[in-house]
């Protein structure tokens, strides 16, 4: 499971001209699911995302988490995080999980992150053509992969 975490002042996702979800200060998370991902990957990633300290404290040091600042989260499914570009110039997504695997894990991630933060998280719509708008803060962008826990 992979996520790209962007610290934002605000973000929203629009589908067919209608805003589906919007948040204020917090994280926009692009989430990709791989065929071999499990609930254990969800649990590890939720713990890391909720506890990640990339918001400034009173001294201007990145020392506060999303939970600490009572921030919001917007989670958007993103199978293209598993693009393979080894052969040729057209990416392949053979490592991205099938719909049957990825939808339940995406929903589990959103539910568990909501529980960890004590508030609902915004979501996109799985498989939809979405327009994502954000105002990066910093910018601070972090990539996490449950198969590479560095």
Question: Where is each model-derived feature located?
Answer:
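N-terminal, polar/charged subdomain of small-to-medium soluble alpha/beta proteins
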Residues: 1-89, 97, 104-150
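Glycine-rich, phosphate-binding/catalytic loops in enzymes
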Residues: 93
């Amino acid at each position: 499971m992979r996520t790209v975490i962007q610290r934002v002042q605000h973000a929203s996702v629009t589908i067919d001209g209608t805003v589906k979800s919007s948040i204020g200060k917090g994280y926009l998370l692009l989430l990709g699911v791989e065929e071999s991902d499990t609930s254990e990957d969800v649990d590890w990633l939720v713990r890391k995302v909720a506890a990640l300290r990339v918001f400034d404290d009173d001294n201007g040091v990145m020392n506060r988490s999303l939970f600490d600042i009572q921030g919001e989260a917007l989670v958007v499914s993103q199978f293209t995080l598993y693009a393979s570009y080894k052969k040729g110039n057209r990416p392949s997504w053979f490592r991205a999980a099938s719909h049957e695997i990825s939808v339940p894990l995406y929903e589990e991630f959103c539910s568990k992150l909501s529980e960890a933060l004590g508030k609902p998280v915004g979501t996109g719509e799985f498989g939809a053509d979405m327009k994502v708008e954000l105002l990066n803060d910093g910018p601070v962008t972090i990539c996490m992969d449950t198969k590479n826990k560095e």
